[in-house]
Amino acid sequence: MEMVGKIACFVVLCMVVVAPHAEALSCGQVQSGLAPCLPYLQGRGPLGSCCGGVKGLLGAAKSLSDRKTACTCLKSAANAIKGIDMGKAAGLPGACGVNIPYKISPSTDCSKVQ
């Protein structure tokens, strides 16, 4: 019986050691998730399906590293994409009924994201 316990312990240990780690959030995921928001942020369309992307991003950014990545990607997009209404960008989480731990803005300090 003692041998069975050792084998079971070894099997569990192997499962923990080789368990797949969740993929880290990428800028590509952030951008594709929020692509439906672009017309709204540029004043060319309604909020529409944008909130699904915002909520999906919030759900995907579970770790501190993911939240900082999302912040950095959003900050870069806010700087790179022309015609974004920064007021709408900053108000996007509230308009979608979610709370994110930083402001969507080119001036956000993503190193302070918690």
UniProtKB/Swiss-Prot annotation:
Keywords: Disulfide bond, Lipid-binding, Signal, Transport. One of its GO terms (biological process) is lipid transport. SMART domains: AAI. Pfam families: Tryp_alpha_amyl (PF00234). It comes from the Eukaryota. Transmembrane segments: none annotated. Residues 1-23 form the signal peptide. InterPro entries: Bifun_inhib/LTP/seed_sf (IPR036312), Bifunc_inhib/LTP/seed_store (IPR016140), Plant_nsLTP (IPR000528). Disulfide bonds join C27-C73, C37-C50, C51-C96, C71-C110. One of its GO terms (molecular function) is lipid binding. Gene3D superfamilies: Plant lipid-transfer and hydrophobic proteins. Plant non-specific lipid-transfer proteins transfer phospholipids as well as galactolipids across membranes. May play a role in wax or cutin deposition in the cell walls of expanding epidermal cells and certain secretory tissues. Belongs to the plant LTP family. This is Non-specific lipid-transfer protein 2. It comes from Nicotiana tabacum (Common tobacco).
